[in-house]
A protein has these predicted regions:
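Residue-level signal for short hydrophobic patches within transmembrane helices
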Residues: 39-58, 62, 85-92, 168, ...
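Alpha-helical transmembrane segments of multi-pass membrane transporters/permeases
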Residues: 127, 182-206, 223-226
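Hydrophobic transmembrane alpha-helices of multi-pass small-molecule transporters
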Residues: 88-91, 203-207, 233-237
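Transmembrane alpha-helix boundary and packing residues in multipass membrane permease domains
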Residues: 49, 53, 65, 102, ...
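Helix-terminus/linker motif at the lipid-water interface of multi-pass membrane proteins
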Residues: 54, 58-77, 146-153, 209-216
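Short alpha-helical transmembrane segments in multi-pass integral membrane proteins
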Residues: 2-46, 104-171, 213-247
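Small-residue-rich hydrophobic transmembrane alpha-helices
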Residues: 76-136, 173-192
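Interfacial/gating helices of multi-pass transporter permease domains
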Residues: 44, 67-87, 154-158, 218-219
Length: 247
């Protein structure tokens, strides 16, 4: 755990060092919000955030479209019944990641190494704990949550199966949002979007394979989403741990 967060800190420090040396320019992946035109920098930084939120919703949308076409209306209802709660969870953890990013950006900009290290460690550990708690709660409480949401009885079994498999991947989307928050806090909002677009494509391909070709059922659509979310989280973690800021 400390080794992982230490590598993340090392990445941030490499960015900081090159920033201090003035070796970074506008063609690089990092957007320096303190230099150049304010409006242009805001647009360049904010557009990936907007499209990132859009593509995060594409997971459930793709599941609904593919399941509805291959498995029928009941299966579509089973997937769609969880859409609002998934939207709420994504928004909630996006907010937490943004809050953590503000703290990290502050210490990064002030060059307070010790506080930056603590903030990164706390963000990573908190994300893992939240993911595990959410996974456990989802596995246990999925049927009751769906009943509270007034899910029709005829689709409740399939909806519960989808929901439980989706919650198994809670750790992936929580960590993804945390890693994105760290990257964005040092000015890189584009690479998380690239990874999310790629993982969305992976999700669609796996949906078609699991549901359309192998006929595994509604739960397999959730499994496709979980796999693709782990892909996006792993790509973000790889960039934080191993890639140079200029890559």
């Amino acid at each position: 755990m400390r080794q992982t967060s230490g590598r993340v800190l090392a990445h941030c420090l490499r960015l900081w060092k090159e920033w201090g040396q003035g070796s970074m320019n506008n063609t690089q992946s990092k957007t320096l919000l303190t230099e150049g035109s304010i409006w242009r920098k805001m647009v360049v930084f904010a557009l990936p955030l907007f499209f990132g939120n859009l593509f995060q919703q594409l997971y459930n949308t793709a599941d609904s479209l593919i399941v509805g076409n291959f498995l029928g209306s009941n299966a579509l209802a089973a997937v769609s019944s969880s859409g609002s709660l998934i939207f709420l969870l994504v928004g909630f953890f996006n907010g937490i990641a943004m809050g953590a990013g503000v703290v990290i950006a502050r210490y990064y900009g002030a060059r307070e190494i010790n506080e930056l290290q603590k903030a990164i460690h706390t963000t990573v550990v908190f994300g893992i704990l939240c993911g595990l708690v959410l996974m456990t709660a989802g596995l246990i409480l999925a049927p009751q949550i769906l009943i509270w949401m007034r899910t029709p009885k005829e689709v409740l079994p399939e909806s519960t199966a989808y929901f439980r498999v989706y919650f198994i991947g809670s750790l992936a989307f929580v960590l993804y949002n945390n890693f994105v928050g760290i990257l964005q806090s040092v000015g890189d909002s584009r690479h998380p979007l690239y990874y999310l677009i790629f993982s969305s494509a992976v999700n669609i391909v796996l949906d078609l394979l699991f549901v359309g070709v192998l006929h595994f059922g509604v739960a397999s659509a959730a499994a496709a989403t979980v796999i693709s979310q782990f892909v996006s989280a792993a790509l973000c973690l790889y960039r934080l741990m191993y890639k140079s800021p200029d890559d």
